[in-house]
Amino acid sequence: MRATTKEQGFYSQIFKLVLPIVIQNLLSAAVNSADVVMLNYVGQSAISAVSLASNYANILFMVYYGLGTGATLLCAQYFGKGNMRAIQTVEGIALRFSVIISVVVAGIAFTMPQMMMRLFTDNAELIRIGASYLRVMGVTYLCWGITEIYLAVLRSLGRVTISMAMNMMAFALNVFFNACFIFGLFGFPKLGATGVAIATAMSRVIELIGCVIVSIMSKDIKLDLRYMFIRNKLLFSDFVKLSLPALGNDLSWGVAFSMYSVILGHLGSDAVAANSLVVVVRNIGTVLCFGVASAGGILLGNVMGEGNLEKAKEYASKLLKLTVVTGAVGGLVVLGITPFVLKFASLNETAMHYLKYMLLINTYYIMGTAVNTTLIAGVFRAGGDTKFGLICDTIDMWCYAVPLGFIAAFVFKLPVLWVYFLLCTDEFVKWPWVLKRYKSGLWAKNITRDHLFEDEEKE
């Protein structure tokens, strides 16, 4: 692999990584979106309740993504350096954090699901449906925290097909069990939103079992919880310094983005129902963009781990150009899917009106997301620059987008679509600062260390 980054060209390497990651991201989005799509056959209240409850899964995903980012950027560079022992240690550190967080959130979901729903809505029916859904989803959170870290480590080593296979399996099982619990197939009871939560939990449990099987067959990188107890002060310090800003960045952005749902949730169930389907379509439109960002981050990490910073800058330039293309493609995908979504959706007239124009707004919004994700989460993080994203996104979301949304909705009482349009300006506001940081080249660093385990060997 270390020779590969030196001998092969950028595009040949990036496309080998992109396709499996895109398929994985598409399936990962599909696993979470299948709940909302299939609940279309149950009713608008079920869609709205699950859409609001899913905000917790979205926030948790941001947490796991932040932890996985710290693991990925360290593991990618140490893989470029050829240090497998360091990779195992980093995996254990990431698992330690993810398991603790998963247990805490699952415990709250088991015991206080009504309280969790009241943060998003005061509608009694939505609270009842969402609470039942969340209580079962606690099982999903426990499994998810483990599998996301293990698959992130495998991706950082370029083993992206394994992650793709795991997500394909989870998606297929989720859709199958969803159908069983929604339509009562094969003798299963019709359980509506609760059945969808059970289906998701079952698919995640089986995905975890699949990861354990992969681990048993692997010669070097195992899914071994004993890794959590490996102690290395230098790597722990590096992981915390890199992961905490990334985790803070993703949490800050994720919670702020959930505030969009809070705003829309208080503008009526029609806005919530429309937005729940828009999120599904937007996730499909952005999978290629996120795939390029993830693949670029892995490739740049390997190159910088080898110490070739100039080549990393050259690759980053090509990656940005590729991102603009994928952003345009993503917008066209949303535009192309829109007629089918409008034909498929079973919403009332007002919600359908919102849905149509929200989808059109997202045809350009994806370009802003694509550029920022590639630079902040791909290029900058590959070189260990995680603090910039934290500062940039926190200011953008909490000082601009969220206050703007609340003022537009509750002070000026603008129409729903105007509120949504203003919320969707968040990505473009930060472009000047993100592009300035990219052009500075300050993100290009080799963050690996030599002689990590010398003190242990002396003892």
Show which residues each predicted segment covers.
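Short runs within selected transmembrane alpha-helices of multi-pass transporters and secretion channels
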Residues: G68, M137-S156, S163-F171, V196-C211, ...
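Interfacial/gating helices of multi-pass transporter permease domains
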Residues: L39-N58, V90, A124-I129, A193-G195, ...
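N-terminal transmembrane alpha-helices
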Residues: K6-V37, Y41-V42, N58-G70, L74, ...
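Short alpha-helical transmembrane segments in multi-pass integral membrane proteins
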Residues: M1-I21, C75-T140, F188-S243, L300-I366, ...
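Transmembrane helical elements of multi-pass membrane transporters/channels
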Residues: K16-D35, V136, T147, A170, ...
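Small-residue-rich hydrophobic transmembrane alpha-helices
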Residues: I47-F110, W144-S163, S261, A274-T338, ...
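Helix-terminus/linker motif at the lipid-water interface of multi-pass membrane proteins
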Residues: L26, A30-S48, M117-A124, C180-L191, ...
